[in-house]
Regions:
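Local cysteine-cluster metal-coordination motifs and their immediate loop/turn environment
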Residues: 1-6
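Core AdoMet radical
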Residues: 8-17, 31-46, 57-76, 84-120, ...
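Surface-exposed beta-strand edges and their flanking turn/coil or helix-capping segments
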Residues: 18-19, 51, 78, 106, ...
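Alpha-helical scaffolding segments of alpha/beta enzyme cores, especially the outer helices
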Residues: 23-26, 48-58, 79-82, 114-117, ...
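Short hydrophobic/aromatic-rich motifs at helix boundaries and adjacent loops
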Residues: 24-25, 53, 89-92, 129
Length: 180
């Protein structure tokens, strides 16, 4: 996708194969890490994503999904939010701003609206509560550092609640380092 710092996209051919997924699952079962943090681009596109989540949860791990929210609107993923909630997966979702204009400039037209609908789907299942964590990620547009995380979190919480009825747990501020 044009905004991605690792040039990830649904049309890319580089995906984790079954052998690698099996090795990861075997390692998780053997070592039982406290956290399994699954990231991508959009890691849910991997045919092994649900198996990785299920096996990690079976091993007693806390699972986090670095989710771009728009995946919840894509054909074939209509049940993804149910799967995530059923497995109590912490969702860490990219939302580079709480306004449509800024998100459109960074990620393209329609992304903000899809992201809001995705957040509303997650909220409807209880995400944003203590049991189903929903954390958002802010990253500034262009080569600059983000502002104060606590101030931005308060701004996000007020704007998203007022405009869309959306709640979430925390906001994380990051700065992307282009590596692709």
């Amino acid at each position: 996708c044009r905004h991605c710092h690792v040039d990830a996209a649904p049309w890319r051919t580089e995906m984790m194969d079954g052998t690698t997924a099996d090795k990861v699952i075997d390692w998780i079962k053997e070592h039982r890490p406290k956290n399994v943090d699954i990231t991508g681009g959009a890691p849910e596109i991997s045919e092994h994503f649900r198996r990785l989540v299920s096996e990690s949860k079976s091993a007693g791990c806390h699972v986090m999904d670095r989710n771009n929210l728009t995946i919840l609107e894509e054909p074939g993923y209509e049940d993804l939010h149910f799967f995530l909630a059923e497995h109590e997966v912490e969702v860490i979702a990219s939302l580079p701003c709480y306004t449509s204009d800024n998100v459109s400039r960074q990620r393209g037209q329609g992304v903000f609206e899809k992201s809001i609908r995705g957040l509303q789907k997650l909220n409807a299942l209880g995400y944003g509560s203590e049991n189903l964590k929903l954390n958002l990620v802010y990253n500034p547009l262009g080569p600059k550092l983000p502002g104060s995380q606590s101030e931005l979190e308060e701004d996000y919480k007020q704007a998203l609640k007022k405009e869309f009825g959306i709640t979430f747990n925390q906001l994380f501020c990051i700065t992307n380092q282009p590596i692709a």
